[in-house]
Swiss-Prot record:
Gene Ontology BP, a term: organic phosphonate metabolic process
UniProt enzyme class: transferase
Cross-referenced Pfam families: PhnH
Listed name of the protein: Alpha-D-ribose 1-methylphosphonate 5-triphosphate synthase subunit PhnH
Keyword Cell cycle attached: no
Family per record: Belongs to the PhnH family.
EC numbers: 2.7.8.37
Organism listed in the record: Rhizobium meliloti (strain 1021)
Catalytic activity: methylphosphonate + ATP = alpha-D-ribose 1-methylphosphonate 5-triphosphate + adenine
UniProt function note: Together with PhnG, PhnI and PhnL is required for the transfer of the ribose triphosphate moiety from ATP to methyl phosphonate.
Length: 200
């Protein structure tokens, strides 16, 4: 498949139904942080943008949601694919986007480089969509907070070594801060800024 043809293919076959399905899965995962949601819909974005990350983009992005992409994604067909299928524009400035996407293995900068919202409007922040190697099999972490009863153990594989430090700093500025969607293949795991994480 040529780079040009990749731009126009790989979106939802039934955009309304599939976007609604993905949206419900994401809302459920944000309401119950730490659970793994399996997306029942198929997206085939251009590499290196992953399947679940592409589905998130198709569901949440539109012309009112600027998007930031990692350097590798920016050099791929992903910017044109996202723009064609969602209408979202790509920005080079980290403090502007509503969503930021990272492919598997990409370096994730400090969360404070992105929009963190304000005390009055904490929702005006960036949601990071980060693909990891897997959502299980990594360093076990205990999650606590709203939507979590008695704690939950998560073990995403492929998080940066400094992730817990970044997350602790993010929680310290609540209600401001970023929210996080981890993806792997067709699955997602959501971590709102209210979730506290520590090593098991």
């Amino acid at each position: 498949m040529t780079a040009q043809s990749q731009i126009y293919s790989g979106a939802f076959a039934d955009p309304v139904f599939e976007a609604q399905s993905v949206f419900r899965s994401l809302m459920d995962c944000f309401a119950r942080p730490g659970i793994i949601g399996r997306l029942s819909t198929a997206a085939a974005p251009p590499a290196p943008l992953g399947e679940a990350s592409g589905a998130v983009a198709l569901t949440l992005c539109d012309h009112d949601t600027p998007v930031w992409l990692s350097p590798a994604l920016s050099k791929s067909s992903a910017p044109k694919w996202i723009a064609f299928h969602t209408g979202a524009g790509v920005t080079d400035t980290k403090d502007e986007p509503r969503f930021a996407f990272f492919e598997k293995g990409a370096a994730v900068p400090g969360f404070d480089q992105f929009a963190l919202g304000t005390q009055e409007y904490p929702d005006r922040s960036t949601t990071l969509v980060v693909e990891v190697e897997a959502l299980e099999g990594g360093q076990p972490l205990i999650g606590r907070g709203p939507g979590i009863k008695n704690g939950i153990v998560i073990a995403p594989k492929g998080l940066p070594d400094v992730f817990l430090d970044l997350w602790a700093a993010n929680r310290a500025i609540f209600p401001r801060g970023i929210d996080l969607v981890l993806t792997a293949r067709e699955a997602v795991l959501c971590l709102p800024r209210t979730t506290k994480l520590e090593r098991e």
